[in-house]
């Protein structure tokens, strides 16, 4: 009996010591922003030192360098850091415990959206040596805490190439986005989140889920019903306002394409609200297209240093509550995502007229929900000092004790807005059956290299071969006004042709994880594909045969795997 009591006391003391040790370490290891008392943004060199300390104290953490920024006249290359935090101390995908879901967090693709980065560093600390360490029993974490070191240093949206990283997820011109996709395809997490900041907003945290119709609708429904509902509930307990992420855009303008519109082309006075973009060029749908539970988080922001602490806190709890929700539903998430991924590959092995890929779509109204009521800030004529605890009549004496603090900026009052131009739905307007594969002429090596950047498997013909292919003849084409936009109109006639496929031409089978992405990138009518970027020189003339062919025969081809030794 004495031995049992002694053992219990010993175990309790041991647990307490471990817990106290973790708390002490988390309090000792401060993020760079905490060190400066949130008077400065964390920079790459400071982040490196912070991660070194985390790596030293946390055997569960592995830090890797996954790339470098490009060198410019005023900026030397900076490392891109990647944190793997797992209970098993995994250093590569084969070491992951796949019984748990894996969560990839990408922060601050836009350099001036600083709180996402600061919150990611807090999350790393609390997972590695702090109070969130128990989460590692149920969830694997992959974190890119600063995706745009250049933009962060100069507090600007774009990177050192003057590229908007969150519009580069199709053409992959930046080393930063190439690194993101390499990490995603190497580890294939079930859940991802891309973290940003929006403008000043009543809603401190907004989270959006997948929205492209080529992504299975079950993922969107599960995201909203099972995850976002729980995140909203937990944020509310913290006094943090939440709404699913909404976008305001001028009607007739694609605000998510990455276009730098001329002022005269942005004169539409009518605006609409919708959920986040259907485009595949961002850090959410570009990963969601692999049947991933993919999210975007937008924290409210004035983009000033004075509010950095509170903005970081809002973002942190958004990350934390989403991670806790995933961890609590891990088995269901693993089953859902993996089943959809396997089903997509199996479907792509067989040509079926009813197996459609959606190429063009539009935002649409919902008859059941013709309008939406949201809360907004409206500038107040006089500063708001507080809120009355109890209503008072005009002329009643008022003291400070009669007021509770006003939870919003004093220059704003909260008003309700009824949005009439509300477009919550997405409707496909151009769809085609997915072929078994595509044939790309050797002359379009740039297309092939970009697809390799997406980790799409490509094969090369080892000999000339006569084949029956499906080709598009262009009947009408109206080019876009801007780079990054698809042709305003492109009509095609599909024809079956006999052609000689040349030795050195390329073949891409759709029977792989990127099945839907492949068609979206290569089809001429796609609003998401390579045709929208001038760099690929794919805009045809009327009467032309589009140079990328469809292949729908179940036939053995003289091909071998292709690798680019330039990479």
Segments from the language model and where they lie:
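Soluble metallo-hydrolase cores and metallopeptidase-like ectodomains found primarily
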Residues: 44-105
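Bacterial N-terminal signal peptides
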Residues: 10-21
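Bacterial N-terminal signal peptides that target proteins for export
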Residues: 2-11
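Active-site/substrate-binding loop(s) of hydrolase catalytic cores
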Residues: 96-269, 273-278
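Structural recognition of the beta-strand scaffold that forms the well-ordered cores
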Residues: 64, 81-83, 102-106, 142-145, ...
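Hard-cation-handling environments
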Residues: 252-469
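Acidic/histidine-rich, surface-exposed loop or edge segments in extracytoplasmic proteins
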Residues: 27-38, 105-107, 209, 427-434
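Catalytic centers of hydrolytic enzymes
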Residues: 427, 432, 437-441, 448-453, ...
């Amino acid at each position: 009996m004495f031995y049992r009591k002694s053992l219990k006391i010993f175990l309790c003391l041991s647990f307490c010591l471990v817990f106290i040790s973790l708390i002490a370490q988390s309090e000792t290891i401060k993020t760079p922003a905490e060190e400066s008392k949130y008077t400065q943004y964390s920079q790459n060199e400071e982040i490196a030192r912070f991660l070194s300390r985390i790596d030293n104290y946390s055997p569960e953490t592995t830090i890797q360098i996954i790339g470098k920024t490009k060198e410019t006249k005023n900026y030397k290359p900076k490392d891109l850091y990647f944190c793997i935090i797992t209970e098993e101390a995994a250093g590569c995908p084969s070491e992951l415990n796949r019984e748990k879901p894996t969560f990839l967090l990408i922060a601050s693709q836009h350099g001036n959206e600083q709180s996402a980065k600061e919150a990611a560093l807090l999350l790393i600390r609390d997972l590695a040596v702090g109070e969130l360490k128990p989460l590692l029993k149920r969830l694997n974490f992959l974190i890119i805490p600063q995706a745009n070191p250049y933009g962060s240093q100069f507090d600007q949206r774009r990177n050192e190439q003057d590229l908007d990283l969150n519009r580069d997820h199709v053409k992959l011109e930046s080393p930063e986005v190439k690194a993101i996709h390499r990490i995603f395809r190497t580890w294939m997490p079930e859940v991802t989140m891309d973290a940003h900041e929006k403008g000043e907003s009543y809603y401190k945290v907004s989270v959006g889920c997948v929205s492209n119709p080529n992504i299975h609708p079950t993922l969107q429904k599960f995201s909203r019903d099972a995850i976002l509902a729980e995140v909203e509930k937990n944020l509310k307990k913290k006094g943090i306002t939440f709404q699913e992420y909404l976008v305001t855009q001028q009607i007739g303008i694609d605000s998510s394409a990455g276009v730098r519109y001329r002022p005269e082309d942005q004169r539409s006075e009518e605006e609409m609200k919708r959920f986040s973009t259907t485009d595949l060029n961002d850090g959410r749908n570009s990963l969601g297209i692999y049947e991933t539970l993919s999210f975007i988080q937008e924290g409210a922001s004035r983009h000033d240093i004075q509010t950095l602490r509170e903005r970081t806190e809002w973002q942190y709890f958004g990350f934390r509550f989403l991670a806790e929700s995933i961890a609590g539903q891990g088995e269901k998430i693993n089953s859902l995502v993996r089943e959809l991924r396997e089903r997509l590959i199996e479907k792509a092995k067989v040509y079926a007229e009813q197996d459609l890929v959606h190429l063009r779509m539009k935002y649409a109204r919902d008859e059941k929900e013709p309008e939406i009521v949201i809360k907004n800030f409206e500038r107040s004529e006089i500063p708001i000092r507080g809120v009355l605890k109890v209503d008072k009549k005009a002329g009643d004496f008022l003291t400070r004790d009669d007021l509770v603090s006003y939870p919003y900026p004093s220059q704003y009052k909260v008003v309700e807005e009824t949005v009439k131009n509300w477009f919550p739905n997405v409707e496909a307007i151009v769809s085609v059956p997915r072929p078994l594969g595509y044939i790309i002429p050797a002359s379009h090596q740039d297309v092939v290299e970009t697809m390799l950047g997406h980790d799409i498997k490509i094969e090369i013909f080892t000999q000339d071969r006569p084949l029956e292919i499906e080709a598009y003849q262009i009947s009408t084409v109206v080019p876009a006004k801007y780079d990054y936009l698809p042709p305003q109109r492109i009509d095609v006639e599909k024809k079956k042709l006999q052609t000689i496929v040349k030795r050195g031409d390329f073949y891409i089978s759709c029977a792989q994880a990127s099945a839907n992405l492949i068609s979206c990138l290569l089809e001429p009518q796609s609003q998401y594909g390579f045709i929208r970027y001038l760099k690929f020189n794919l805009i045809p003339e009327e009467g032309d045969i589009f140079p990328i062919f469809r292949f729908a025969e179940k036939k053995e081809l003289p091909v071998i795997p292709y690798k680019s030794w330039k990479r």
